[in-house]
Amino acid sequence: MASASARGNQDKDAHFPPPSKQSLLFCPKSKLHIHRAEISKIMRECQEESFWKRALPFSLVSMLVTQGLVYQGYLAANSRFGSLPKVALAGLLGFGLGKVSYIGVCQSKFHFFEDQLRGAGFGPQHNRHCLLTCEECKIKHGLSEKGDSQPSAS
């Protein structure tokens, strides 16, 4: 009978990696798989799209407007450098404003994967090892029953 239970434990743990090879994000109960490739893909898309769709156009438009204002005489050109300092500053400000204006779009892309990312350092539960507090996690990380319990509504 003891050999049957030992064999049952081996079958149960056969699909789990050994503890020495488990990552910090491994949870035996939820089997949460963090899609790091998807996260890096979203970050790369956000960087490229924010550059091409917002930062570059804002920068070019602000530089053209500033050059036009200097040419029309509304802004004074520097005697040594001409309009270059004002145009360069306008370009930098336009670039920065373009990047900042795209933050909301990138946040909405990350919210699409919110459930998958919640255990990987995003959201209020980012310090927890598992999304679900299983018995193995409680034992492994020494979680107490007092700290994990939530107050009742009554």
From Swiss-Prot:
<dbReference type="Pfam" id="PF07051">
    <property type="entry name" value="OCIA"/>
</dbReference>
<dbReference type="GO" id="GO:0005739">
    <property type="term" value="C:mitochondrion"/>
</dbReference>
<dbReference type="InterPro" id="IPR009764">
    <property type="entry name" value="OCIA_dom"/>
</dbReference>
<dbReference type="GO" id="GO:0046427">
    <property type="term" value="P:positive regulation of receptor signaling pathway via JAK-STAT"/>
</dbReference>
<keyword id="KW-0999">Mitochondrion inner membrane</keyword>
<dbReference type="InterPro" id="IPR040187">
    <property type="entry name" value="OCAD1/2"/>
</dbReference>
<keyword id="KW-0496">Mitochondrion</keyword>
<dbReference type="GO" id="GO:0005764">
    <property type="term" value="C:lysosome"/>
</dbReference>
<keyword id="KW-0967">Endosome</keyword>
<feature type="domain" description="OCIA">
    <location>
        <begin position="1"/>
        <end position="120"/>
    </location>
</feature>
<comment type="subunit">
    <text>Interacts (via OCIA domain) with OCIAD1/ASRIJ and STAT3.</text>
</comment>
<dbReference type="GO" id="GO:0005794">
    <property type="term" value="C:Golgi apparatus"/>
</dbReference>
<dbReference type="GO" id="GO:0009617">
    <property type="term" value="P:response to bacterium"/>
</dbReference>
<dbReference type="GO" id="GO:0061484">
    <property type="term" value="P:hematopoietic stem cell homeostasis"/>
</dbReference>
<comment type="function">
    <text>Has an essential role in the assembly of mitochondrial respiratory chain complex III. Is also required for STAT3 activation and plays a role in cell migration.</text>
</comment>
<feature type="region of interest" description="Disordered">
    <location>
        <begin position="1"/>
        <end position="22"/>
    </location>
</feature>
<dbReference type="GO" id="GO:0005768">
    <property type="term" value="C:endosome"/>
</dbReference>
<protein>
    <recommendedName>
        <fullName>OCIA domain-containing protein 2</fullName>
    </recommendedName>
</protein>
<dbReference type="GO" id="GO:0006897">
    <property type="term" value="P:endocytosis"/>
</dbReference>
<keyword id="KW-0472">Membrane</keyword>
<feature type="modified residue" description="N6-acetyllysine">
    <location>
        <position position="41"/>
    </location>
</feature>
<keyword id="KW-0007">Acetylation</keyword>
